[in-house]
């Protein structure tokens, strides 16, 4: 899986960062999934190779506007781009009427079926490539993290099973390797039944706003990547005395170290943290605080940067 960050700022955009939106991209092909959709997300997409037509589902972590105000525009543009395949939108039930009424009030026609699913009732979402589950977080409003787990990654033909069942090597094997259904000796064989993963599935957790990383203790075990907010540094919280339901870089880093998280990606940075290291406070303060508590692979997400999770389990920037 790849991650492409479309927005990494908390609350409001800055000149360098837009508000929250993260693309999770399938290992093979161009299909992708969107976690959160802050205002301006569709404009950020124009600077990436991602197509709205290839978007398979949208997941919204909570109701705050910096995570969802981009939805109406994105949906309208999806319709104008010629999308016709159904789109599933998993979001808090409190936003369902807001989405519907916004489309109606603006006389927006969607040439595709929009399926609204309540995140509060989501036990599991899946297709042939991924399984998605939720973990409850702690914020001023209900918030969740989404756990993306690959299904049957990089499938290879189970030749031992084929030989054991007496299915001769030849064109049938080629069809089954594509996942197609074929006929053999009067029986229909589903290609998916003869495919097995060639490596362990990868698991990526993309979190909404959260002031208690320990809530991730169970799902973080064995996860390949944890994407978590680091809105503040400890120094700022000690000076202001408030967190507004958010985490510090230190708190997230301590948790990730204790949980054995191999790749930690911090995002959702307060607009006060400048990109220029000569300014104070700056984004290097966030990095330094996290590195003081975490010894794994640390990444501070950047807008429009794509990251690839390699076979060696390391998350690296692309390009």
UniProtKB/Swiss-Prot annotation:
Binding of Zn(2+) 1 occurs at 62, 64, 139, 209
Q: What class of enzyme is it?
A: hydrolase
Q: Which domain of life is it from?
A: Bacteria
Essential cofactor(s): Zn(2+)
EC nos: 3.1.26.11
Q: Name one GO molecular function term.
A: zinc ion binding
The entry marks the following residues as binding Zn(2+) 2, namely 66-67, 209, 268
Sorted alphabetically, which InterPro entries does this protein's record hold?
Metallo-B-lactamas (IPR001279), RibonucZ/Hydroxyglut_hydro (IPR036866), RNase_Z/BN (IPR013471)
Record keywords: Zinc included? Answer: yes
Function summary: Zinc phosphodiesterase, which displays some tRNA 3'-processing endonuclease activity. Probably involved in tRNA maturation, by removing a 3'-trailer from precursor tRNA.
Q: How does it assemble?
A: Homodimer.
Question: Which protein family is it in?
Answer: Belongs to the RNase Z family.
Annotated protein name in UniProt: Ribonuclease Z
């Amino acid at each position: 899986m790849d991650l492409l960050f479309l927005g990494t700022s908390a609350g409001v955009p800055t000149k360098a960062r837009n508000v929250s939106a993260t693309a999770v991209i399938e290992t093979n092909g161009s299909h992708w999934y969107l976690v959160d959709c802050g205002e301006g997300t569709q404009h950020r997409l124009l600077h990436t190779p991602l197509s709205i037509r290839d978007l398979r589902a949208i997941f919204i972590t909570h109701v705050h506007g910096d995570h969802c105000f981009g939805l109406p525009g994105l949906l309208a543009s999806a319709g104008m781009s010629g999308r016709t395949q159904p789109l599933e939108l998993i979001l808090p039930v409190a936003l369902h009427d807001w989405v519907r009424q916004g489309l109606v009030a603006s006389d927006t026609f969607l040439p595709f079926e929009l399926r609204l699913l309540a995140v509060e009732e989501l036990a599991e979402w899946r297709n042939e490539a991924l399984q998605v589950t939720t973990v409850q977080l702690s914020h001023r409003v209900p918030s969740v993290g989404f756990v993306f787990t690959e299904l049957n990654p990089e499938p290879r033909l189970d030749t031992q099973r084929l030989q054991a069942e007496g299915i001769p090597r030849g064109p049938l094997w080629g069809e089954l390797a594509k996942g197609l259904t074929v006929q053999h000796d009067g029986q229909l064989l589903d290609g998916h039944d003869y495919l097995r993963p060639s490596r362990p599935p990868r698991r990526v957790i993309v979190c909404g706003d959260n002031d208690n990383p320990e809530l991730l203790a169970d799902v973080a075990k064995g996860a390949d990547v944890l994407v978590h907010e680091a809105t503040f540094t400890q120094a700022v919280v000690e000076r202001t005395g408030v967190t507004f339901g958010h985490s510090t870089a230190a708190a997230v880093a301590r948790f990730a170290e204790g949980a054995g998280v191999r790749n930690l990606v911090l995002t959702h940075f307060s607009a006060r943290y400048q990109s220029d290291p000569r300014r104070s406070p700056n984004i290097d303060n966030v990095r330094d605080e996290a590195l003081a508590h975490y010894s794994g692979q640390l990444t501070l997400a950047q807008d429009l940067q794509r990251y690839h999770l390699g076979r060696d389990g390391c998350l690296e920037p692309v390009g």
